[in-house]
Amino acid sequence: MKKESPSMDQWLQEAKRHESAPKIGMYLTHNGIVRQSAKAKVRHGEAGTKSVTGMVFSYDADKVNAVIAETYKLDGIYYAKVWLNEGQLQVGDDIMYVLIGGDIRPHVVDALQYLVGRIKNECVEETEIYTIF
């Protein structure tokens, strides 16, 4: 069942009150959404793909939690929070929010790439729904 999206402002306020906040010089957020262009077209350049009208999305919470724990082992990373939607989603719906906090920009950028990449590749299942015509 589709969930209500969290407030990034609230997440940032919570992060800045967290015990790790004095060590953090940068927070970086990611907001993945359902797009109309099929993954096959965007990632692989396949021509003639139908437009996406939605997606069925699910995830393995234990795997996500394990990946978050691994993210804390990266250099300079002191804060990580993830929210994932689920169920049948429409174009424009939020799929994922990620907030990463760390000491310096290169560490935080690398950690965001690492965390989002591992979640997308190891923890979620996405089934695109296409237009019929």
What are the functions of these language-model segments?
Residues 1-94, 101-133:
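N-terminal, polar/charged subdomain of small-to-medium soluble alpha/beta proteins
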